[in-house]
Amino acid sequence: MAKTTKVKGNKKEVKASKQAKEEKAKAVSSSSSESSSSSSSSSESESESESESESSSSSSSSDSESSSSSSSDSESEAETKKEESKDSSSSSSDSSSDEEEEEEKEETKKEESKESSSSDSSSSSSSDSESEKEESNDKKRKSEDAEEEEDEESSNKKQKNEETEEPATIFVGRLSWSIDDEWLKKEFEHIGGVIGARVIYERGTDRSRGYGYVDFENKSYAEKAIQEMQGKEIDGRPINCDMSTSKPAGNNDRAKKFGDTPSEPSDTLFLGNLSFNADRDAIFELFAKHGEVVSVRIPTHPETEQPKGFGYVQFSNMEDAKKALDALQGEYIDNRPVRLDFSSPRPNNDGGRGGSRGFGGRGGGRGGNRGFGGRGGARGGRGGFRPSGSGANTAPLGRSRNTASFAGSKKTFD
């Protein structure tokens, strides 16, 4: 039993040792398992790490490959991109060149448009400037024309003023015999501007000739006097008024136009363009204002005794004649401007010698043979008788007439 017990004990001890061994083994196994597990885990981890490393390496390799591939791809892509970029750059360069060309074209167009616009603007500006110049020229012309018109108007006004400022004289006719200078002046004093009045008398007598003259300061007063006094009764008789003004300027124009030059000075004046109605006494009174008048002569036709349209006024000296010529040149006498000039002095000899077979000399004493008495001569010779008939039937001087003798029979009628 004891053996059995020992055996059982041994068995138990064996079992326990086995169990311990098993437990140890289990523990070892567990530890080993743990270690194995750890190792496995480590291995696993290592494997995992390796796998991971491998994977990483593979991944890295793959990555490297991929990177290489990607790099190659990227390189290819880069190359393609480069090519594309080159192409794009070339295209961009082309496009840029095209764009530049287009820009240049646009710039040229812009420049052309600018030039055209500038040319248009310049042309428009030039046209505007030309139009402005034309307008300015037109304005200048208008201003010049206006100035000329103003000058003409001012000159006309000056001439009118000068004409109005010049003294004027009116003729007063149909006066009463009893009216004298003072009476005539008083009748016109209410008009204003009266300088003086004079009544024309017959020479050597105190008898009025029925007319006179009234002098005014200017033409306006004279015209007013004619308007107001025409037909007015003075001393029971209606008077007649008319303008009688002097215009020396007109005669000066005539002298310039026709080249009239005065002759050598003398004490006698020649009066040309004299009215046929000119009165000798009126001429005497007019010229006596400028000097001592000796005589007034108005030649007439011997047959009709009508004036010839000219006359002579003789002064006592040459200075008075010069004064009268300067003052009265172009003076209106009976509404006609008279032309004055110095007259050559008349010869003071006793007369010329009468010519034979002609008229006697001017102023000669007695006419010659077969002549008439000279002009102003005492008695002309009696004209001779010419038996030869008229001058048409007479033979030339120094030759005898050759006439055929009558050889026919004479017939008589009973």
Curated annotation (Swiss-Prot):
GO cellular component: mitochondrion; nuclear envelope; nucleolus; nucleus; small-subunit processome
Region named Disordered: 1-172, 244-264, 336-414
Compartment annotation: Nucleus; Nucleus, Nucleolus
Chain ranges of the RRM domain: 168-246, 267-345
PTM annotation, UniProt: Methylated by HMT1, forming asymmetric dimethylarginines (DMA) within a domain referred to as an RGG box, made up of repeated Gly-Gly dipeptides interspersed with Arg and aromatic residues. Pyrophosphorylated by 5-diphosphoinositol pentakisphosphate (5-IP7). Serine pyrophosphorylation is achieved by Mg(2+)-dependent, but enzyme independent transfer of a beta-phosphate from a inositol pyrophosphate to a pre-phosphorylated serine residue.
Compositional bias per record (Low complexity), positions renumbered to this chain: 27-44, 54-73, 118-128
Signal sequence residues: none
Modified residues (Omega-N-methylarginine): R353, R357, R362, R366, R370, R375, R379, R382, R386
Main location: nucleus
Induction section of the entry: In response to low temperature (By cold-shock).
Gly residues bias: start-end ranges: 351-386
Phosphoserine: residues bearing it: S93, S95, S96, S97, S116, S127, S129, S131, S143
GO biological process, one term: maturation of SSU-rRNA
Comp. bias (Basic and acidic residues): 10-26, 78-87, 106-117, 134-144
Keywords in alphabetical order: DNA-binding, Methylation, Nucleus, Phosphoprotein, Repeat, RNA-binding, rRNA processing, Stress response
Region RNA-binding RGG-box, annotated ranges: 366-384
Other information: Present with 77400 molecules/cell in log phase SD medium.
Function summary: Involved in pre-rRNA processing. Specifically binds nuclear localization sequences. Candidate for a receptor at the nucleus that may be involved in both RNA and protein transport. Binds telomeric sequences of the type (TG[1-3])n in vitro.
Annotated protein name in UniProt: Nuclear localization sequence-binding protein
Organism of provenance: Saccharomyces cerevisiae (strain ATCC 204508 / S288c)
